[in-house]
């Protein structure tokens, strides 16, 4: 079991703790599939909602909050039945807008894993306005059920009435819809090829700044992030932050980064290079490779 979960395990009911320990091996990064979840439910004899709330300390152990020292975990449950954990991240010395909220982390985890619909968000405190707006960008976002301790489950529309969202800006394929922009570049570099794939799947209906980030560690592992825009603009999730969140979930130190690539479309009305460089340089002494691609 990874050391970062030692304190969290102590907070779980004993039957659940015993059942989940085998999952928390060196490769665990916050994903529990539907079959594993069913096995945890059977072993713990807990109702599903009770079980998901009980797992929040495990999600919170994924957090990296050097500024606030406040660990927040969230869980997104997809239509597949799989659950995806996420946690907050803060970048040392950088402005707070560089932070990743736990709900953003969990949703991006599900998105990167191929989920097309998120049905439930489980979190230990009421989602802030920023996160409510981010959830509202999803396919059927207003219908996403929010689960909180000691409160009745309610859809996002209860927490964000009279919401402003993608439909108000004539966007008919919101976040988690299948996106496929064709971005090509003649390259045999595996990192660039991976980045092109993710940039093509990014979500940027408002600026057309389709983009992705790929981070490589010294052992050759890669971690990706895609741009995820928001109708309210400010809650948009940057690809660098998503990639760093992915690294954190996989228990990798940012000091292990030895290469970083940002790929973005030439047709975007904005560029993400400045924001990506600031975020990267707060955690790693690595130059950002910036590649601008003509979309087909």
Swiss-Prot record:
Homodimer. The keyword Phosphoprotein does not apply. It comes from the Bacteria. InterPro entries: APOBEC/CMP_deaminase_Zn-bd (IPR016192), CMP_dCMP_dom (IPR002125), Cyd/dCyd_deaminase_Zn-bd (IPR013171), Cyt/Deoxycyt_deaminase (IPR050202), Cytidine_deaminase-like (IPR016193), Cytidine_deaminase_bacteria (IPR020797). This enzyme scavenges exogenous and endogenous cytidine and 2'-deoxycytidine for UMP synthesis. Substrate binds at residues 88-90. Coiled coil: none annotated. It is an enzyme of class 3 (hydrolase). Belongs to the cytidine and deoxycytidylate deaminase family. Residues 47-167, 186-296 form the CMP/dCMP-type deaminase domain. Zn(2+) binds at residues 101, 128, 131. Its EC number is 3.5.4.5. GO terms for cellular component: cytosol. CDD domains: cytidine_deaminase (cd01283). Keywords: Hydrolase, Metal-binding, Zinc. One of its GO terms (biological process) is cytidine deamination. GO terms for molecular function: cytidine deaminase activity; identical protein binding; zinc ion binding. The active site is at 103 (proton donor). Disulfide bonds: none annotated. SUPFAM superfamilies: Cytidine deaminase-like (SSF53927). Binds 1 zinc ion. Its cofactor is Zn(2+). It catalyses: cytidine + H2O + H(+) = uridine + NH4(+); 2'-deoxycytidine + H2O + H(+) = 2'-deoxyuridine + NH4(+). This is Cytidine deaminase.
């Amino acid at each position: 079991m990874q050391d970062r979960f030692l304190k969290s395990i102590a907070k779980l009911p004993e039957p659940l703790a015993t059942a989940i320990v085998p999952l928390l091996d060196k490769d665990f990064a916050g994903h529990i599939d539907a079959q594993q979840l069913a096995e945890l439910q059977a072993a713990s004899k807990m109702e599903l909602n009770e079980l998901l709330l009980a797992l929040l300390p495990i999600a919170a152990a994924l957090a990296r909050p050097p500024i606030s020292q406040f660990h927040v975990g969230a869980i997104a449950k997809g239509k597949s039945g799989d659950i995806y954990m996420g946690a907050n991240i803060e970048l040392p010395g950088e402005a707070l807008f560089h932070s990743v909220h736990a709900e953003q982390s969990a949703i991006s985890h599900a998105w990167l894993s191929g989920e097309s619909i998120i049905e439930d968000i489980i979190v230990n405190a009421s989602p802030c306005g920023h996160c409510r707006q981010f959830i509202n960008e999803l396919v059927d976002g207003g219908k996403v059920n929010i689960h909180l301790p000691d409160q009745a489950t309610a859809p996002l529309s209860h927490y964000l009435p009279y919401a402003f969202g993608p439909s108000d800006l004539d966007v008919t394929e919101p976040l988690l819809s299948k996106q496929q922009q064709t971005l090509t570049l003649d390259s045999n570099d595996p990192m660039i090829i991976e980045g092109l794939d993710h940039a093509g799947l990014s979500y940027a209906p408002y600026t057309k700044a389709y983009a992705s980030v790929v981070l490589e560690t010294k052992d050759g592992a890669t971690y990706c992030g895609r741009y995820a825009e928001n109708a309210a603009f400010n809650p948009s999730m940057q690809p660098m932050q998503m990639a760093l969140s992915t690294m954190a979930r996989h228990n990798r130190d940012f000091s292990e980064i030895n290469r970083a690539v940002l790929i973005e479309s030439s047709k975007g009305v904005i560029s993400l290079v400045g924001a990506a460089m600031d975020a990267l340089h707060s955690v790693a002494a690595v130059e950002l490779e910036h590649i601008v691609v003509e979309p087909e």
